[in-house]
Amino acid sequence: MQPPATETAWPPARTAWFAAIVLMLANTLAFVDRQALALLVQPIKQDLGASDTAMSLLYGLSFTMFYVLVGLPVARLADRSNRRNIIAFSIFLWSIATAACGLARSFGTLFAARVAVGAGEGGLSPSAYSMLSDYFPRNKLAAAMGVYQMGIYLGGAMALVLGGLIAGSIPPTSTIDLPLLGATKGWQCLFLLLGIPGILLSLLLLAVREPARRVLGGDHEVAPLSAFFRHLGGRKAAYFGIGLGFALMILVGNGTGAWIPAFFERRFGWSTAEIGAKYGLIVFFCGTSGALIGGFVASWLQGRGIARGNLWAAVVGFTVLIPITIAFPLMPTPELALALIGAMNFFAGFNFGGGLATLQELTPNRMRALVSAGYMLLINLVGATLGPTAVALVTDYWFRDPAALHYAISFTCAIASPLSLVCLLIGMAGVRRAQRQAEL
């Protein structure tokens, strides 16, 4: 575990929290753009003639494809250059790509636009995690990470609520004649509108200061890759245990999140507007409160001197998620399903602050963006790609019935949720060994 650097004072609290809030807004926008697709599965399928499996690839693989190719090199750049500027450019890029989704006239062009969204978003979180670790001391870092991760749920909720409201005014299956663009479907209009806020946010980000790096031993140069892999190899149980644990948790989150709107449509006959309003509010209140409370609980445990307090908070959340994720798709009424989905969002958000803070504490400053990119790569390959696709494959090829979607969701969660806890416990044991080695 890396001891705190002492060369410079920490930034003023007001400056640090302003940066955390602006970065949270960037994360919010990223998830608005990402989650909006889940609300539009049915109209896009109808217009483009896509299957559930094809839509799952559009939701997961298209985003991950360029994240894999772009995320790691951009993170390497972030470890040696201005992270704020990287984030500002990334926001601008994915916002243009989101608007391009509204211009798509075929599945192939929509897939290509989603690839560009992934390329842009690949520059956000690794740089943001690294910046936050230079803004906040160890006893406050988990809380700051929790605030940043609130963006996941704010973004998901905004996509659902605003998407539902827009769908009430401009039905996704309707056709509108727009100047220059001609006949445009309602779902395409939503993507065009979503591209606008990011351009403004990329300008706001310029008001955030790039924090001084808190390096150890006067080493201000980026670490060579050989040193990076040597550091990683000496702590592989910690890094891969935590990474796989969160990847499997996100597999459950993305696998359910991508299909929950379709779940309510198919099982309970809800409209797009009804889903957006009700499910969106659940995500907003439960997810954001979980991320905020979980981050502060982890910081409180860490501040009390409890060994691996950050991760103990996550262990509680992972454990509670197991029965909830398996049970919610099987509820006989939409109200019971929504109640359990609310609990699922709360405890999923509860876990992030402590887990992310642990990864930053475990890593030297000039390796943090690259480690964060590796973490994001893992959770996107396993979670973002496999989650929606796993549910779709079980629906299409195991049950062979779109109406059995709720069974497919429950089956997927019954495998992934317990495995996520096992991996996290392995990671915690690895952190304990790394701490003991650092004390020798």
Each language-model region and where it sits:
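Extracellular/periplasmic helix-loop-helix junction of adjacent transmembrane segments
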Residues: 40-69
